[in-house]
Amino acid sequence: MKLKPFSLAAALLWAMAAQAQVQVSPSAPPGPRLEDPAQRALRERQDAERHREATQPAPQIAVAPGAPDDASVDAVAEPGTTFDIHRIELTGNTVLDADTAERVTQPFLNRALGTNRINLLLRRLTEAFVARGFVTTRAYLAPQNLKNGVLTIAVVPGKVEALQINGKTVRSTVSDAKPADGPQAGGWLTDAGTVWSMPAVGDTLKLSDLEQGVDQINRLRRNQAEVQILPGQAPGGSVIALANQPGDRFRFSAGTDNYGSRATGTTRLRAGIDADNALGFQEAVSLSYIGTRDTNAAIVSAAVPFGYNTFSYTGSLSEYNSLIGDTALLYGRTFGHTFGWNRVIERDQAGRTAFDVTLTHRRSEREVNNLLFEPQSLSVLRV
């Protein structure tokens, strides 16, 4: 599914903080321009995540196929009894706006309607529900007297009656439903992350909400979730049946490459650990280390989904050594904190539009031959 970016330039805030700890010039000496190893590692991780997201297949959700297009109202023959209908009322409608409802019902007004044409109207309403993602909402014709020229159609919004994970019920509106014993989604403590990602029990079922939930769950590499919509016990009720056999909670990695710089050493050593949904909040946590001859970088990151929102944090610490001439040793250290919020504001069959906010704060310290220079702080807000 192609992602549609939503980007907007925002504010850039500078703050210079702290006092020099020794009496030296406030400006740092000219030295080699070195890239922060932690920032480089973060960029490589973000590039890999964007590539994985772009190549991730669309959620697999099994629903009934939509009804085919039908002929015009006048082309539908009525061999039986008909009634002249001049007004059509929809009761219980909470899913179609007034303009859409009028566009569907208008062709049937001021016409003689019988069983065949009324069935066509019900089918057209169902098609309108499905087109907007309300795949379990239905329209019904209640017993009534049509001699007064008014046709009343009852709309029954499809509700989420229960949520099942691998055949076990974890949430339900049915009083006698037996809850699952312990977490079912692969976490040690809870299934809260899966419940947060999927539509809430009692809500009107909408296909885009299901797709968003499956996307949130499958953003973790250990998950390959699929969803089926099963009939519930109550009229209009549906059971969201989530099937997922998660892989390992933890992934370990170690290796070496030659992507370092000449100034600090081309050979890089890498080690990391990733934990996916270890607790049950569908959280992603990672710890990583990258080092060269003269650099070290440690990074910790965490992300937790909540419906259409994803909250994240990344912290980093990096340090480096570099010679200035033959007599001076430059030592630098950088602390970084990044808080992120991603909100999917619209999604359809063509893609999705997301709103992304990050607040980054960095503090850099440099010293030459153990003489500390004035630290520098930078805060950046991106929208």
Question: Which residue ranges define each predicted feature?
Answer:
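Periplasmic polypeptide-binding modules associated with outer-membrane biogenesis and secretion
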Residues: 22-260, 272, 288-297
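Residue-level detector of the transmembrane beta-barrel scaffold of outer-membrane proteins
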Residues: 164, 226, 241, 251-253, ...
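N-terminal signal peptide c-region/cleavage motif recognized by signal peptidases
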Residues: 15-17
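Outer-membrane beta-barrel domain signature
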Residues: 115, 203-204, 258-262, 286-291, ...
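Hydrophobic, lipid-facing positions within transmembrane beta-strands of outer-membrane proteins
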Residues: 267-273, 296-300, 335-339, 379-383
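Transmembrane beta-strand segments of outer-membrane beta-barrel domains in Gram-negative
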Residues: 310-383
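Transmembrane beta-strand segments that form the barrel wall of outer-membrane beta-barrel proteins
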Residues: 250-260, 271-277, 281-293, 313-323, ...
